[in-house]
Amino acid sequence: MRYIGLICLIFIFNSCAIQVPPSGGEKDTKPPKVLSTTPENYSTNINANNIEIEFDEYVQLKDANTQLIISPLLNYQPTTKIRKKKLYIHISDTLKANTTYTLNFGTSISDLNEGNLLENYQYIFSTGSILDSLKIKGKVENAFNLKKDKNQLVMLYKNFDDSIPYKERPLYFSKTNGEGEYSINNISPGSYKIIALEDKDGNYLYSKGDELIGFSDSLVSSGKEDVKLRLFKESLALKLARSQSSGPGQATLIFTAAADTLKLNWLTDLSKIDFYSQVFSIEKDTLTIWYKNTDSDSLSFYYNNGGKNDTVDVRLFKRKSENSRNKFSLESQTIDANSNHNFSEPYQIEWSHPISKVERGKFILKEDSVPISKIDLFFSDSLKTKLNVNHKWKQKSQYELTILPGGLVDIFGLRNDTLILKWFSKSEVDYGTLALKFSGRKEASIVQLIDEKENVIRQVRVNRDTVVTFNYLDPMIYRFKLINDKNDNGKWDTGNLINHIQPEEVEYYPELITVRSNWDVEVKWDK
């Protein structure tokens, strides 16, 4: 009886074991194959609330919530379940009459054993007698850098109101692939408003300021296959985003957009804080205020914002409290000691505070260990934080600059400690020259010489056929970027959805350019 019981136990265990696909043999590299669907794929006159898809092997479903795209959009995401070799989908929404639905599974389906993907499998059905077969195709790219990203939404609307992306989810939609390409399939005949969206929050609605958006200047007819959309981030309405005091004598106002035309009305008596100066950032969206009375504790002002006055109070760092935590001192922010320096340019030293006094006798410059009796010192900014040291630099020479204590005095009366900076002046043959010849250009343009990381190395403005020469370039790989500066304001301008303003167009020279030491390179760029 003991042996009979053991045999029965083994039989029961095997009957209850989890079923897994067989292993062994040659490695499987083929994706799963669909054997059948219920209802049948491409069926008409059905309400396919329950769908069954059978495969030729065991499958798994990953990231269905993000990968499974259903168009037209449903109110609720369908539920999915895998059982053996079958995938079950349940749609709880009430389906629209006479509508073609497309279920695109993206990269969610793969075989269980090797993970081979069945990419972009589609299940299509119609609740009416006609299966819509028209499509709209195209590409989406970033308007500023022409990058093409995957999973950007492209949406179609029958409501043509300009504000529709803010308040209504699309009728049809699709997502871009890694090349920025999209295809919205199985749509009904007609004209549509088309919108591209970087949908960060996944709600199929536009959130201004946080998300990129792109639009077509005109309605798009079904069947069109070359609709290009350019994504951009709109400028926010001008207002103060935040204010802060990063240290005694300094307050910073950060705005949502360029604020250099905004009038600030001071409630604080500026003579009490001993106001010194104010300066905007390059983008004009950040204002730094300098004042000399470092025992001041607050700064107040108001500005007009759309017909009403907004009052702002900035709590200031007091010098006494700052000294208890950090040393309040005049510091050099130039950290490229022992670096190479372009002999054709002044040597620049940036300081933490505006400078009020320079003692030239406390600057000692040596050229290959030999003292230089005369050097030129000047500031290149109105705030007097960027001190330039100029001399007729010799090529292939070692320089050492010593600034003795008290060589500089800032607006707070602080003096520098001893500072020693060293650099090497390279030879002219260590650099290359790049000439860019334009032809066919009549409109105002900005030409940027950039590196492979899109950092701007040099920039010039042109409005005609010309030759632009860039001298003393470090040997490396460069690119040319051109901004079509329509309003001739010297910068790239973004777009505006409601006002139908497209972002300014940009172009890239189609090839990378290698600059070598002691070489001249000429590039022709025809429009």
Each language-model region and where it sits:
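Acidic, low-complexity Ser/Thr/Gly/Pro-rich repeat segments typical of extracellular/periplasmic
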Residues: 16-195, 209-215, 236-431, 448-472, ...
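Extracellular interaction modules
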Residues: 222-227, 518
